[in-house]
């Protein structure tokens, strides 16, 4: 036993990895590229050797001249590796084998060889392995143009692994996670800047990755627009809506604290929602998503609200939800409800709130709540504090959505780190807060996420709370929402007199993925930007549609995890049809419940319902192929359109999921990611690029 105060042994790459992952560095890691990505990023971050890709030592150069056309070479090696990982037949790519041997031979050397670049050849090998592994992770999460004929079965296995475990790696998630990366910041010099397809995360936050086909039926493929109906409700918040929790006031040392609840006196006005949708649809052809603030809807109102939205063709709902306690002594619930309509069922996803709101004396005066909450007591929101988790939803065309509740936006914790590493397309934050002015806290934290990783951010609060917010010497404001685009200014969104809601129109487009290690930029990412704002005043009459639910809500045909897995296999079918139709049968064999790869990855067999759905999907694809129509993608679209009409519920869902994946694949044009650059010009290191404009304010 080492004596206390004695000098510990010098750490090595092997000992660092053993401490982090609980395993050794051996050739077994090469069987699964995300495992090697986890290894290389861990070593680069712990040693800070990632900095040498940005600023190599004086006697070295990066990218390395001993690898001809290094940017092309690592991309090609990644593609070859993804193909090899399917069956593991033959040798691994030469560049991968050469750099891996350099690392393996040095794993027991002092860690300072990496930290101080004493062994530059080892540093160079580690950076090259990291780039190759990152390229081999292309398409494991968001299957955009990173997909190709190489590795179709490998990619769908990775997607199912992600859906089941919340990680792309085989390493236990309680040690670390490997997650897909959606967006990369244009600047930055952390280890995150060295990857564009994958990211590594320390344990502590549970993550669920969802994939839901929520594109409205009949939407033209060229239509990239998204219309959000923002309902900043309640329109009136009374002082009596804030209530002290009975017998909750206590004194700790010299400070008195207690708990409060927010319970609006009026429920959700579904008739007004109906008339708002009538008015909005008079302005635009469709409303894709309805958004409401924190605690705007009671849990028992969700089903009726979604039934109404279905009648109007709305496919998404993002709303703060409050829930009464289930038993005496329990605190109320507070979360974001994300509802997605597939065409056959509403998928429900719950993003919990992790941090309580605290009202001090200044805020009690600001919101004029002194008659309900004593100003000399620090009041904490009465809510259960759940385990930290993050729900990330992929909704098609590379777009991903994350939602945070109020206080969670302002916390710099593991959830925030995960969001910055993954880089969702948009972060939606329902609030119970004052005006969303560019000078207030929500704008500051929105700007952080818009800068790094480059997500669009939407915040929405209640008009009633905005009107209650009247700090001394200031007039009330009507700014209920805020939109921040990456690289652009903040848009303050006000609710005009006589309006009850706002129509926010946005659009998606391709975005560049860049890395700081010298690889070529590729335009296979996606971004979301705002276009216009329109004030919505409720129509005088409603739609006349019946929307109250009748009886109990039917259970979903597939749960969210199963629907995600079904969507993953639909993408694999689309990839096979687009690039290598002869591989369709091999992909089908991998989808079978008894396929051996699941046991190798420690995954359970699909449930009976999921297995039935996957089998039906492959039958549809094979039937379409047998017609002989060309191209295969069009043949499948025609076939599922015909089958969809009048089919049983699960068959309809299968056809819709398959059609969504095939249409998206058909609609994508070739990109730089599919056709490598032919120029001999070497890539420019970030240090040589012109400086980025600093964020205003």
Regions found by a protein language model. Name each.
Residues 267-354, 442-447, 451, 600-612, ...:
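Cys-nucleophile CN-hydrolase/nitrilase-fold catalytic domain and related Cys-dependent amidase chemistry
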Residues 196-221, 329-422:
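Active-site catalytic loop in hydrolytic enzyme cores
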Residues 28-31, 39-46, 53, 63-80, ...:
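Long, compositionally biased intrinsically disordered regions
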Residues 5-132, 140, 302-319, 329, ...:
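CN hydrolase (nitrilase-like) catalytic-core segments centered on the catalytic cysteine
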Residues 52-236, 240-256, 293:
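Long, charge-dense tracts
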Residues 231-234, 288-289, 294-296, 316, 399-401, 404-408, 425-426, 430-433:
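Structural motif
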Residues 219-272, 360, 365, 374-391, ...:
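Short, compositionally biased "basic patch" segments
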């Amino acid at each position: 036993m080492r004596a206390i105060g004695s000098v510990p042994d010098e750490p090595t790459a092997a000992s660092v990895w053993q401490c982090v992952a609980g395993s050794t560095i051996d050739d077994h890691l090469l069987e699964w590229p995300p495992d090697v990505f986890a290894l290389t990023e861990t070593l680069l971050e712990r040693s800070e050797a990632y900095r040498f890709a940005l600023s190599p030592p004086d006697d070295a150069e990066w990218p390395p001249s001993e690898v001809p056309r290094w940017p092309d070479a690592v991309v090609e090696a990644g593609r070859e590796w993804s193909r090899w990982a399917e069956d593991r037949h033959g040798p691994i790519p030469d560049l991968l084998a050469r750099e891996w041997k350099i690392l393996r031979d040095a794993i027991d050397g002092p860690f300072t060889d990496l930290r101080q670049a004493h062994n530059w050849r080892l540093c160079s090998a580690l950076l090259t392995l990291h780039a190759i592994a990152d390229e081999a992770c292309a398409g494991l999460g968001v299957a955009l143009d990173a997909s190709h004929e190489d590795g179709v079965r490998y990619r769908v296995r990775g997607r199912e692994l992600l859906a089941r475990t919340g990680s792309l790696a085989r390493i236990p998630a309680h040690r670390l996670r490997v997650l897909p990366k959606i967006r990369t910041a244009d600047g930055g010099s952390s280890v995150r800047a060295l990857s564009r397809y994958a990211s590594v995360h320390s344990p502590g936050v549970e993550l669920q990755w969802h994939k839901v086909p929520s594109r409205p039926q009949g939407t033209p493929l060229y239509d990239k627009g998204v219309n959000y109906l923002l309902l900043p409700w309640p329109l009136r918040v009374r002082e009596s809506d804030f209530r002290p929790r009975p017998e909750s006031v206590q004194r700790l040392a010299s400070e008195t604290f207690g708990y409060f609840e927010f319970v609006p006196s009026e429920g959700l006005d579904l008739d007004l929602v109906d008339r708002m949708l009538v008015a909005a649809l008079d302005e635009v052809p469709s409303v894709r998503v309805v958004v409401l603030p924190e605690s705007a809807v009671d849990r028992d109102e969700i089903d009726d609200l979604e039934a109404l939205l279905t009648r109007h063709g709305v496919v998404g709902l993002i709303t703060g939800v409050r829930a009464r306690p289930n038993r005496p002594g329990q605190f109320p619930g507070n979360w974001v409800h994300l509802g997605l309509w597939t065409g056959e069922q509403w998928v429900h996803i719950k993003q919990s709130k992790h941090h309580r709101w605290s009202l001090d004396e200044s805020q009690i005066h600001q919101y004029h709540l002194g008659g309900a909450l004593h100003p000399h007591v620090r009041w904490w929101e009465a809510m259960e504090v759940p385990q930290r988790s993050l729900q990330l939803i992929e909704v098609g065309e590379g777009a991903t959505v994350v939602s945070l509740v109020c206080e969670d936006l302002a916390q710099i914790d593991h959830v925030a780190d995960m969001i910055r590493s993954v880089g969702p397309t948009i972060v939606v934050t329902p609030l119970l807060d004052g005006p969303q002015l560019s000078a207030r806290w929500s704008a500051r934290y929105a700007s952080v996420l818009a800068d790094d990783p480059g997500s669009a951010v939407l915040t929405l609060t209640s008009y009633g709370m905005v009107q209650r917010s009247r700090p001394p010497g200031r007039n009330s404001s009507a700014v209920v929402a805020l939109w921040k685009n990456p690289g652009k200014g903040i848009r303050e969104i006000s609710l005009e007199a006589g309006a009850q809601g706002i129509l926010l129109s946005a659009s998606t487009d391709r975005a560049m993925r860049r890395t700081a290690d010298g690889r070529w930029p590729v335009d296979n990412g996606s971004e979301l930007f705002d276009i216009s704002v329109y004030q919505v005043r409720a129509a005088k009459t409603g739609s006349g549609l019946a929307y109250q639910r009748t009886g109990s809500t039917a259970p979903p045909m597939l749960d969210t995890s199963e629907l995600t897995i079904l969507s993953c296999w639909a993408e694999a079918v689309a990839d096979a049809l687009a690039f290598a139709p002869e591989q369709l049968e091999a992909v089908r064999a991998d989808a079978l419940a008894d396929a051996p790869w699941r046991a190798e990855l420690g995954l359970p067999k699909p449930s009976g319902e999921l297995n039935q759905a996957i089998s039906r999907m492959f039958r549809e694809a094979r039937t379409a192929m047998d017609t002989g129509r060309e191209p295969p993608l069009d043949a499948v679209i025609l076939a599922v359109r015909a089958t969809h009409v009048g089919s049983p519920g699960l068959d309809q869902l299968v056809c819709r999921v398959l059609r969504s994946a095939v249409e998206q694949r058909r609609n994508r044009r070739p990109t730089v990611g599919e056709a490598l650059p032919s120029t001999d010009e070497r890539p420019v290191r970030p240090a040589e690029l012109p400086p980025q404009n600093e964020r205003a304010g």
